UniProtKB/Swiss-Prot annotation:
Similarity section: Belongs to the VPS29 family.
GO molecular function ontology, one term from the record: metal ion binding
Encoding gene (name): VPS29
Official protein name in the record: Vacuolar protein sorting-associated protein 29
Listed GO biological process terms: endocytic recycling; intracellular protein transport; retrograde transport, endosome to Golgi
Main subcellular location of this protein, as a coarse class: cytoplasm
Pfam family, one: Metallophos_2
N6-acetyllysine: residues bearing it: 54
Topology of this chain in the membrane: Peripheral membrane protein
Keyword set, alphabetical order: Acetylation, Cytoplasm, Endosome, Membrane, Metal-binding, Protein transport, Transport, Zinc
Subunit note: Component of the commander complex consisting of the CCC subcomplex and the retriever subcomplex. Component of the heterotrimeric retriever complex formed by VPS26C, VPS29 and VPS35L; within the complex interacts with VPS35L. Component of the heterotrimeric retromer cargo-selective complex (CSC), also described as vacuolar protein sorting subcomplex (VPS), formed by VPS26 (VPS26A or VPS26B), VPS29 and VPS35. The CSC has a highly elongated structure with VPS26 and VPS29 binding independently at opposite distal ends of VPS35 as central platform.
Cysteine pairings via disulfide bonds: none
Role, per record: Component of the commander complex that is essential for endosomal recycling of transmembrane cargos; the commander complex is composed of the CCC subcomplex and the retriever subcomplex. Component of the retriever complex, which is a heterotrimeric complex related to retromer cargo-selective complex (CSC) and essential for retromer-independent retrieval and recycling of numerous cargos such as integrin alpha-5/beta-1 (ITGA5:ITGB1). Component of the retromer cargo-selective complex (CSC).
Amino acid sequence: MAGHRLVLVLGDLHIPHRCNSLPAKFKKLLVPGKIQHILCTGNLCTKESYDYLKTLAGDVHIVRGDFDENLNYPEQKVVTVGQFKIGLIHGHQVIPWGDMASLALLQRQFDVDILISGHTHKFEAFEHENKFYINPGSATGAYNALETNIIPSFVLMDIQASTVVTYVYQLIGDDVKVERIEYKKS
């Protein structure tokens, strides 16, 4: 595993207001000591959730969601992992939510290879003009203003040299489904 960095990307937990906890099947997969970095798109919403993330990885980066109790989280953050500059934002600043042009503008402003945003509670990962965009969805499957039927999801990025292999974990019914997406830095 030399040269690999495992990055957990998740957000919109909304614990305890909309959900009690992460799905048990996700917790089983998230074992301490395997993950180097955590990038969280916010809306945890409490210190307990933060403390849980700290048990999984030493390096935890969080941006503030519109429901977070901790107002000290920054609005945005740029983190470098290996050869990749990664921008992190909650996503309520993106108007309309998840809008491609707005996301691309943020990507250029932050000057990043990968832009991670949340807020919509809907998983997405795609390449646009040689940059990579990820929305990890809601790790608990919390409802949002527009949608009550949300599939719980999180993302693991395996970063090695100039390649990121993104694994998306979705809890569909009782089964965890995994999808793999590869992005190479041009």
